[in-house]
Amino acid sequence: MGKVTGISGRFGARYGSTLRKKWKEIMEKRYDEHQCPYCKTTGKVIRLASGIWYCKKCNSKWAGLAYTPY
């Protein structure tokens, strides 16, 4: 059975293991289900751009961190 690499498996053996692990942590946080700080709904928050987050349920838009909304 092969090793499970997750989202960073597309890089193969390139870029070094440390950078791939750091990138994997950041991307898993980015695509995780986030909670809206206004309506407290989970799973409806999307990233529009770097640092700009939007809730599909209450239509609120706010500035957060680059890869996480708060």
UniProtKB/Swiss-Prot annotation:
Needed cofactors: Zn(2+)
Keywords: Metal-binding, Ribonucleoprotein, Ribosomal protein, RNA-binding, rRNA-binding, Zinc, Zinc-finger
Keyword RNA-binding assigned: yes
Cellular component aspect of the GO annotation: ribonucleoprotein complex; ribosome
Origin: domain of life: Archaea
Keyword Ribosomal protein (UniProt): yes
Residues engaged in binding Zn(2+): C36, C39, C55, C58
GO molecular function, one term: structural constituent of ribosome
ZnF region ranges: C4-type: 36-58
Cofactor binding remark: Binds 1 zinc ion per subunit.
Single Gene Ontology BP annotation: translation
Subunit structure: Part of the 50S ribosomal subunit.
Role this protein plays: Binds to the 23S rRNA.
NCBIfam families given in the database record: PRK03976.1
Protein family: Belongs to the eukaryotic ribosomal protein eL43 family. Putative zinc-binding subfamily.
Protein's UniProt name: Large ribosomal subunit protein eL43
Organism: Saccharolobus solfataricus (strain ATCC 35092 / DSM 1617 / JCM 11322 / P2)
Lineage, highest ranks first: Archaea, Thermoproteota, Thermoprotei, Sulfolobales, Sulfolobaceae
